[in-house]
Regions:
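Sec-dependent N-terminal signal peptides
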Residues: 4-14
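Outer-membrane beta-barrel architecture
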Residues: 9, 41, 80-82, 115-119, ...
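Short glycine/proline- and aromatic-enriched beta-strand/turn motifs that initiate or cap beta-hairpins
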Residues: 19-60, 147-149, 153-157
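Residues that define the transmembrane beta-barrel architecture of outer-membrane proteins
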Residues: 26-28, 34-38, 60, 71-77, ...
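Membrane-embedded beta-strand positions of outer-membrane beta-barrel proteins
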Residues: 30-32, 54-56, 79, 93-97, ...
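Transmembrane beta-strands of outer-membrane beta-barrel pores
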Residues: 34-38, 56-62, 83-85, 99-105, ...
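Repeated loop/turn-to-beta-strand initiation elements of outer-membrane beta-barrel proteins
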Residues: 49-54, 88-93, 122-127, 154-157
Length: 157
């Protein structure tokens, strides 16, 4: 029960990021982030991984004429490398690449992000940069990204 409450509390955390497009105005994209995935040990302290994160998402765009809000279910596949500290230290460093999609006014928007950060046990913290592309490959938005996520793993490192 305690673990479930922890997961729910972490799921309520959001990933704010700035999205800017000169035709649509300024805005931000938020979503809870809970991961599940596979980790493979290839060295004493290095583990490449692939994860899937899901959750509801919302894109808020502001301009001079109207304010647009799009809420949708968002899925992301991401992978990268973790470097673990030696001994029983619970900290690790990570480099993570995300690719995912969501809908805005019925159009799919592809989101790519590169994130660097740290992990304490199963809780990840990161910062990076993202770009979002509309269906015709035009840049829909871009900007900095802050991430907080929780990992469900099939085994512990």
């Amino acid at each position: 029960m305690k673990k479930l409450l922890l997961v729910l509390a972490i799921a309520m955390m959001v990933i704010p990021s700035l999205a800017q497009d000169y035709t649509r105005g300024r805005g931000f994209f938020v979503r809870p982030d809970v991961y599940g995935g596979f980790f493979a040990n290839v060295g004493y302290q290095i583990s490449p991984y692939v994860q899937v994160s899901v959750g509801p998402g919302a894109l808020f765009l502001f301009n001079n004429t109207s304010n647009n809000v799009s809420v949708d279910f968002v899925g992301t596949v991401h992978g990268g490398v973790r470097v673990y500290t030696s001994g029983n230290n619970p900290w690790s460093a990570l480099i993570d690449y995300h690719v995912g999609a969501f809908r805005y006014n019925r159009d799919p928007i592809w989101r790519h992000a590169l994130v660097g950060g740290a992990s304490y046990k199963d809780l990840d913290f990161g910062a990076g940069f993202q770009m979002m592309f509309a269906p015709n490959a035009q840049v829909f938005g871009y900007g900095p990204l802050v991430t907080v996520g929780y990992n469900f793993r099939f085994y512990k490192h």
